[in-house]
């Protein structure tokens, strides 16, 4: 009897883990762009800066790798973890 209770608990735990894993993949994929979406998103992202060329270069590079560009012209990087966590050798943010 104790063994069947253990098996049921184990199956419930595995099921909950798989459901959690599925939802985490759905949330992670929420910001996924197609590569063709990068240029228009970066054009808007870099629209408020006076350094448009470097902003566009790095934004498109980051978007090509991360397939995500944060909303707005500044900040909101927490919505794109890959974009947010990519740093230069000096430890500064690589993505605008």
From Swiss-Prot:
Residues 1-29 form the signal peptide. GO terms for cellular component: extracellular region. Keywords: Disulfide bond, Secreted, Signal. Its main location: secreted. Expressed very early in lateral root development. It is found in: Secreted. Six disulfide bonds may be present. Induction: By auxin. Belongs to the GASA family. This is Protein RSI-1. It comes from Solanum lycopersicum.
């Amino acid at each position: 009897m104790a063994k069947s209770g253990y098996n049921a608990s184990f199956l419930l735990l595995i099921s909950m883990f798989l459901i959690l894993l599925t939802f985490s993949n759905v949330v992670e994929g929420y910001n996924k762009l197609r590569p063709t979406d990068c240029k228009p998103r970066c054009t808007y992202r870099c629209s408020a800066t006076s350094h448009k060329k470097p902003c566009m270069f790095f934004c498109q590079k980051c978007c090509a790798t991360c397939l995500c560009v944060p909303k707005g012209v500044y900040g909101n990087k927490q919505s794109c973890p890959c974009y947010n966590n990519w740093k230069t050798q000096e430890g500064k943010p690589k993505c605008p």
